């Protein structure tokens, strides 16, 4: 794990910085996604997860996962804060009934309930200070009997990230093809610690490794019918 010393502004700047990074990255996002050698394993993991009914995808990006969800869902809503990402996602999903919402998930309020909320590599972008509020929002968005389904990076990914030191919110530096540098929240979990944290927040969670670098999980509100 690499680390540099830099003072980074605290909340709420982390959110706008993160959105700015993904807005700038939109044009090159698909190239990096398509070069990921682990994608077949992740898609197989998705096949084992209970994605069905009315589905909400949080942080849909350019729609790479959206296109895998649409046939599993009765209805599909895809949310992202970056208009440049959504423009590509809308083009990708043209001809489907996918509903797109441009909103910052940290200030968004759902206008309906969902059977499944899907998070692909988003949970690691939720800072610890927002974790409880975020999962309260997830509970609010779920229909009774619904679940949160997620895929994400494990702690092993720390060896390839450049973490910025002296920040209250765990932050990594990312460089784009044009040489510009950006900051994003990055919180890495292992399966046992994330399971424990979600249990403490009132969820029945089951998190399992997919490989050395990724995990998949399902979480349901404790006591849900």
Task: Please identify what each model-predicted range represents.
Residues 56, 62-107:
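Class I SAM-dependent methyltransferase SAM/SAH-binding core
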